[in-house]
Amino acid sequence: MNTMTLTPGQLSLSQLYDVWRHPVQLRLDANAIDGINASVACVNDIVAEGRTAYGINTGFGLLAQTRIADEDLQNLQRSLVLSHAAGVGDPLDDAMVRLIMVLKINSLARGFSGIRLSVIEALIALVNAGVYPLILAKGSVGASGDLAPLAHLSLTLLGEGKARWQGEWLPAQTALKKAGLEPVALAAKEGLALLNGTQASTAFALRGLFEAQELFASAVVCGALTTEAVLGSRRPFDARIHAARGQQGQIDVARLFRHLLTDTSAIAESHHHCHKVQDPYSLRCQPQVMGACLTQLRQTKEVLLAEANAVSDNPLVFADAGEVISGGNFHAEPVAMAADNLALAIAEIGALSERRIALMMDKHMSQLPPFLVKNGGVNSGFMIAQVTAAALASENKALAHPHSVDSLPTSANQEDHVSMAPAAGRRLWEMAANTRGIIAVEWLAACQGIDLREGLTSSPLLEQARQTLREQVAHYTQDRFFAPDIECATALLAQGALQRLVPDFM
């Protein structure tokens, strides 16, 4: 199990990916402790001096004008968690819950939240013990923070609700006991600090980004394979073309294609003197389209990495000035817009792949047997596999609708503009699954097309891609049950079988 020292505000994308993919043992950087303690001292001073400060000794939302008596402050924080745990939907998986918890710890440990070190350490203990709170997927509008999902997370700290430990759902009290942990009692401001923040929205979108990176790499490899299968030209990847335009994503994608295709291959030599002048756009414009997608991936990375390291609590404690200031860092609009842009990229990666599949089906365009199978008529070959890819591409067009332009006022119009970032991030998972299915069909089709070139081979890297598939899925000599082959190719893609052939591009 990986051990990670968490320096608040300095998580890298690779660290976040590791947290999502694997259980982790966290250690808090000791340099963070003074800032955490100073923010708590500031909150305690406000209470002791009888000053009124939102979230410390007031109600919440529209009830912010209601002053809470000192003797009720602890109960106020507990009541906040219980009442706000109002989510619906399916439970999030352990990987997503773990990522949300680490993001929450990272934010709280920045020292602007007025939450005791002991509570942060209790969250770290949950991560290290593998105790995963039951967080329901739906119920947040991404402002004021991800209240419902983070309340469900916080229930476990209180010994309420349910949690999963070693794969079993248990009452939270039982899960804590089995893991050797104890519930905590929250002090002033701590319930609000736990609930306010964009950590669920950010985690949802980060998963979308991680999957989009794999899809992008896989699609570039399959696009190169298809270029070979249909006797496409290498000329459109010439560096001079892309330098003349100056779009960095496009320049970098063309370089990836040159890396995969190399200068030539046996397939390329076989049609070196052909009379074709230009390839269809789905081949020729791959650097332009995929380059635009890469730019979106890179911009999304910047936004999400900043948000993963952000303080998105409210109010914020500025201990050096002895002030608590209300603001709006909980509003997840940056995450929502980043997720919307990422959705466009995921949809386009799949759409371009589907067009290349369709190209291979057409004997006039591909110079291959119709639907990539001999004895057509008796055999239907890839006919319906292409229809499946088209269906998935069409679904993604609807799913790519922007969420950040939607808003419904909540909390009696106190919270009158919201981001819808959780939904924006969560739909990326379905889009990624759809696009992975499309790319799986293209991988199958492109390898079949190269097989039909009667022993001609492609570049070394593309032959690796073909061999990886052929170790699991045989060449089609006649029709057979097709769905298991798509499932197998999809699983290989999810494992990064093609991603490892592509140099780092982020």
UniProtKB/Swiss-Prot annotation:
EC number(s) reported in the record: 4.3.1.3
Looking up Pfam families in the UniProt record yields: Lyase_aromatic
Keyword Glycosyltransferase belongs to the record: no
Q: Quote the catalytic activity from the record.
A: L-histidine = trans-urocanate + NH4(+)
Which GO terms of type biological process are on file? L-histidine catabolic process to glutamate and formamide; L-histidine catabolic process to glutamate and formate
Q: Which GO terms describe its cellular component?
A: cytoplasm
Tell me which family the UniProt entry assigns to this protein.
Answer: Belongs to the PAL/histidase family.
Q: Source species, please?
A: Salmonella agona (strain SL483)
Q: Which UniProt keywords apply?
A: Cytoplasm, Histidine metabolism, Lyase
Location relative to the cell: Cytoplasm
Q: What is this protein called?
A: Histidine ammonia-lyase
Annotated PROSITE patterns = PAL_HISTIDASE (PS00488)
